[in-house]
Amino acid sequence: MSEHDPTLPDRPIFRTQGAPGSTLSLLLLLLFSLANTGMAATVDSLEPLPASEWSYDHAAHLLERAGFGGTPEEIARFAAMTPEAAVDLIVNYEQIADTLPPFEHSGIWDEAMLADVDLHLRFDDVMAKAAEVGEVYGEVVREEGPRKLQDITDALYYKYLSSNREWQRVAQWWAERMLTSPRPLEEKMTLFWHGHFATEELKNDDYRLMLQQNMTLRQLATSDMNSLLIAMSKDPAMLLYLDNRLNVKGHANENYAREILELFSLGIGNYTENDIKEAARAFTGWRNQGLTFIDDRAQHDEGMKTVFGQTGNWDGEDVVDLILQQEAAGEFIAGKIYRFFVREEISEQMLDELAARLRDDNYAIKPFLRALFLSQDFYSEPSLGTQIKSPVQFLVSTYRKLGLERIPGTPYFPAATNLLGQALGNPPNVKGWDGGRAWLNPSTILLRNNLIGHLLFPETAAGAYPRFAYSTRYSNAPAEARQRDRDE
């Protein structure tokens, strides 16, 4: 058992003489890849990795995939354990106290101003309501003048702006949790479910809904698919995002029914259009009032519905039960979790075995992850150093490797990940982020390179970009002096 990786230095890496580009390239290589020498685990095998083969490199791989990486000291600590002990410590994180502070609201979202507002309304709805009743958002339509709705427009813009600003603070708070949590799998799974049950703050314009959803996903991170699907079907942020407030008896809106079948549970080709229509009827009357789920029985369709060939007076919870009776659910969910934690390519044999295991355990997530993290396939050569990290994983894991205890103020985390293609709380659409190679293009590769350069060589970066200056020595020095320092 290796307690120390001989490829890692015993002291910090300092910049040496020579071409800075070469040094940076070497460090980038170290950051982007993992050593995989001496690892001969079997591909497509769910048999546990033998304790005799467990090593420092295996421990590093586990921490990287099940969390956001670790420092050499953390890796060595896990390498000194047995594989079972290491995996159990990560998976059974409830045994570790969550000592991180809750989100602290700034107060920019004025509860008093918006107390009597229908927060479901979009801009056009607000204008129509104002014209109809003469006031909205506590503001009265002006009786005369060219801009009769200006006060209402101002209130609407305040709602949008205050929610957006506060959500940026939530994203920063969440990034701090990813970096510092003693329960890294909890945050990794929260990130996974955020991409799976994609919801947009910019559409909902209410950061509180998104924060509440984030906390729900964290609470149920390794629970089971039945609990998760029901929770998200009743989640105010999700209901608002997919327009289920418009899904009422006699006028079913199919948005949520379509997405729960296509994107959240079964995948395309495993349901019919009639299944969507009938499932939509089952979800009628499910809406929210602010942060509260409402089951409006007056708007629920009590008629008989046929979903997946089974007929009954189904409601939303019944539909979730029917979904999980389909074999395709096991394949869809097992495959998505596998691709997130292991690698993009999965054999038919492995998918069938994982799906069967998930179904046999009633779609429980924790035992599924434990089996995955212990498996030889997880540590096999095709699984090592082949994952293209999302921008969030890329930044957080880099900070963890550098031993940072706080997310730096510069670059600003929400802005940096947004530039790299991943804005927490605002996936591109209900499908979430494509991931994999989609994270990389000429622009994002250059941005990743520059970001790493800025982190590793802040003084060099300050010389090139004075607005990120770390000292007056570099921000004020003439260009030739900065160049002379580089050459020394």
Task: Set out the residue ranges of the language-model regions.
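Bacterial N-terminal signal peptides
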Residues: 25-35
